[in-house]
């Protein structure tokens, strides 16, 4: 697990999730989606009121580096321990984020 922060911007403004994260199983499609599972997380913003959402833009902050998220569609699911974020990119990111923690 690694410390990770995702900032997403949509019609409701800016929303974030940060905490301990690891890659979740991801389908082998292009552009490669981002599936991440968070534990011990903190969420802020209105985006989390919806289970499915449109993303205008965003970024992933990991290990002192930033990775852009282009326009995308997203979903999230939550159980008692973790929240899984799924981001389906509409195009490949200029600087793709590596899910290999």
Swiss-Prot record:
| GO CC term (a single one) | extracellular matrix
Q: Which GO terms describe its biological process?
A: aggregation involved in sorocarp development; cell adhesion; culmination involved in sorocarp development; DNA damage response
Q: Any stretches that span the bilayer, and where are they?
A: none
What is the official name of this protein in its record?
Answer: Contact site B protein C
Q: Which domain of life is it from?
A: Eukaryota
Q: Which family does it belong to?
A: Belongs to the csb family.
